[in-house]
Regions:
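Membrane-interfacial helical/loop segments at transmembrane boundaries in membrane proteins
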Residues: 53-61, 134-161
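Glycine- and aromatic-enriched alpha-helical transmembrane segments of multi-pass membrane proteins
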Residues: 114-132, 158-171
Length: 171
């Protein structure tokens, strides 16, 4: 959605042509950077929780030896790509010198264009800070029909300690 706002307000979504938008669109830049940080899996945002859960599943899978060894490595590499594209978007679009050859002079969008992004960024924060309260009941309701019995024990928490998924996140 942030890319759509940027495209609408600047006339392009070509990342090679965009830079310095934080000076012209500071509020939109802040929203986009929080969303980008969530995609990168930064702690206290929803993406961190989902990334940790994904990493945990790759570490604790029971399969053939080569799958058990390769899957966490592949997942870690995929995680680094998420960080890379999130950083590239943030740095290239919002920082650096102001772009000079854009079809339109960028400015903050109308309120109605920001509301959906604001709601999603708020959801990223709420899920990241209060995972058990915000998505715990929904996850249990969705998993129950699939499992068909008692759900296995799981924890939706901000911190699970220093473990393999956390080390994978740090890489």
């Amino acid at each position: 959605m942030a890319a759509g706002i940027i495209d609408h307000e600047s006339g392009t979504r070509d990342i090679r042509k965009l830079s310095g938008l934080i000076k012209l669109m500071p509020y939109t830049a802040t929203l986009a950077m929080v969303a980008s940080a969530a995609m990168a899996g930064v702690p206290l945002l929803n993406g961190f929780l989902s990334k940790e859960m994904f990493f945990a599943e790759t570490v604790f899978i029971t399969s053939t030896a080569w799958v058990e060894a390769a899957l966490p490595v592949i997942a870690t590499i995929a995680g680094t790509f998420s960080v890379a594209y999130s950083l590239r978007f943030t740095v290239d679009v919002f920082f650096g010198p102001k772009a000079t050859r854009l079809p339109h002079t960028p400015h903050e969008p109308p309120r109605w264009m920001r509301v959906p992004v604001e709601l999603l960024v708020l959801a990223c924060l709420i899920v990241g800070i209060f995972p058990a309260l915000s998505v715990g009941p929904l996850l249990a309701a969705a998993a129950q029909p699939v499992v068909g019995g008692t759900l296995p024990e799981y924890s939706l928490a901000i911190w699970h300690g220093w473990n393999a998924p956390m080390i994978m996140s740090l890489i």
